[in-house]
A protein has these predicted regions:
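Redox-cofactor binding/interface segments in oxidoreductases and associated redox assembly factors
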Residues: 7, 42, 158-159
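Cofactor-binding loop segments of dinucleotide-utilizing enzymes, especially the Rossmann-like FAD-
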Residues: 9, 32, 188
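Glycine-rich active-site loop/strand segments that organize a redox cofactor
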Residues: 47-95
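Conserved dinucleotide-binding and phosphotransfer motif residues
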Residues: 23, 89, 122
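N-terminal Rossmann-like FAD-binding beta1-loop-alpha1 element of flavoenzymes
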Residues: 2-29
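Helix-loop-beta segment of a Rossmann-like dinucleotide-binding subdomain
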Residues: 65-73, 87-113, 153-155, 159-167
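Predominantly flavin-linked oxidoreductase catalytic cores and closely associated redox partners
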Residues: 109-110, 115-237
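Glycine-rich FAD pyrophosphate-binding loop
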Residues: 21-45
Length: 237
């Protein structure tokens, strides 16, 4: 029996394993996919914006007033803390013109490799292709390549994500075997803006618009967008 069983090998699960293994707990980290951090790697294809290099009070303006539950998390792991943590993995960073912080490699794979390597050195047990199907007290039953397997732990930490990308592991099937967990209905949080363009915009589909400012009420964002057939999308939104 391990001290902590962590279910989900995305950034939340990896960070939990990173923190708890530093405190010398025995950790088993499982994921239903063949490898961990798949959506994290996909995020890195666009450069992997990790945080913003700006005063903390200004940084908070990047978040909606409707998300006060984020405040304590942001205070406990500030942009400076994020940068210190990344550099502790041997990853070099740079700050872009809008204050966004990126790894110099402009991708996630070097960071993920260093992260997993540190977990391995601390003795974290990593298991793949482990699909959780039922919970019984402090034991979790999994479907594996070799049949069903039960793992018991003193504590179980769920870091299974939402329903954003089934192909990369975020399928929200945990709702079926955790029926007593209350959750809000899943909805997209990173979306474009639909616009019914007039015909003369056709020739601009796929074109970026850079170094702009967008406003919605009191909220302002600086960045860039891309004109698409159905509207606009990109980091600025």
């Amino acid at each position: 029996m391990c001290d902590v069983l962590i279910v989900g090998g995305g950034p939340a699960g990896l960070m939990a394993a990173d923190y708890l293994s530093k405190l010398n707990y025995s950790i088993t980290l499982v994921d239903q996919m063949p490898t961990m951090g798949r959506k994290f790697l996909m995020a890195g294809k666009s450069g992997l914006n990790l945080t913003k290099n700006e005063p903390f009070e200004k940084f908070l303006n990047n978040f909606s007033e409707n998300t006060p539950q984020l405040l304590s998390a942001l205070k406990n792991f500030t942009p400076d803390d994020v940068q210190t943590w990344v550099t502790s993995l041997g990853i070099k960073l740079f700050t872009g013109s809008t204050g966004r912080v990126f790894p110099t490699h402009m991708k996630a794979s070097p960071l993920l490799r260093a992260w997993l390597s540190r977990l391995d050195k601390r003795g974290v047990t990593r298991r793949h292709k482990m699909k959780a199907i039922s919970l019984n007290n402090m034991s979790l039953l999994f479907d594996t390549e070799n049949g069903k397997e039960e793992i018991s732990a003193k504590a179980i930490l769920f870091a299974m994500g939402g329903a954003s990308w089934r192909r990369l592991g975020s399928d929200a099937k945990w709702i079926k075997w955790l029926p007593n967990v209350k959750n809000e209905k899943f909805s997209a949080s990173n979306v474009g803006l639909k616009i019914n363009w007039s015909n003369h915009i056709d020739k601009y589909f796929g074109e970026p618009i850079k170094a702009i400012s967008l406003r919605s009420g009191k909220i302002q964002s600086k960045g860039e967008i891309v004109i698409t057939q159905s509207g606009i999308e990109g980091g600025g939104i």
